[in-house]
């Protein structure tokens, strides 16, 4: 019975610790995150995805606001609809002209960890924005899982 109380107390303490944490704990800042901007071309985005080995990348406005997420699937659909354009035509297609099928939903830096965890269950990364919608970085599912795995190992 005393062991159950200790376990309950330990769980409660862990919940309180998580509630006190904030999104900055997991943030990879914008300077360390590959992203594309609204005036980039289809070719530039394809090359950036290939170079970094990503399957999705944040799309930002020129003023730094988060617009959405471009995925490999978005690019494939665009190329199919344009009859697989050659490299020269790809240079003329602005990335904002590419239809996005699904955006990674952003979280505001001021939101709760629960909001972050809810979003990260369905996305490989969660874009993080300030209260004005300016992109400040991402939180990856991998970082959250590694943190949680470390917590489990320590208990």
Model-derived segments and their meaning:
Residues 1-7:
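Short, small-residue-biased leader/transition segments that mark boundaries at the very start
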Residues 8-26, 84-91:
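Cyclic nucleotide-binding regulatory module and flanking cytosolic helices
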Residues 20-33, 90-103:
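Bateman (tandem CBS) regulatory domains
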Residues 35-54, 60-61, 105-123, 129-131, ...:
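The conserved cystathionine-beta-synthase
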Residues 40, 70, 93, 111, ...:
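Short beta-to-alpha loop/turn elements within the nucleotide-binding domains of ABC transporters
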Residues 54, 58, 66-82, 122, ...:
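Short beta->alpha transition motifs characteristic of CBS
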């Amino acid at each position: 019975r005393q062991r159950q109380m200790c376990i309950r107390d330990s769980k409660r303490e862990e919940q309180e610790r998580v509630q006190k944490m904030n999104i900055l704990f997991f943030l990879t800042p914008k300077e360390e995150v590959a992203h594309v901007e609204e005036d980039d071309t289809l070719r530039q985005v394809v090359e950036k995805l290939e170079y970094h080995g990503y399957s999705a990348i944040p799309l930002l406005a020129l003023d730094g606001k988060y617009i959405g997420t471009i995925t490999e699937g978005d690019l494939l659909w665009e190329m199919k609809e344009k009859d697989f354009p050659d490299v020269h035509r790809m240079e003329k297609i602005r990335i904002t002209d590419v239809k996005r099928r699904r955006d990674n939903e952003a979280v505001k830096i001021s939101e709760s960890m629960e909001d972050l965890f809810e979003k990260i269950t369905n996305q490989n990364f969660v874009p993080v924005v300030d209260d004005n919608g300016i992109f400040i970085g991402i939180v990856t599912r991998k970082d959250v899982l590694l943190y949680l795995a470390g917590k489990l190992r320590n208990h």
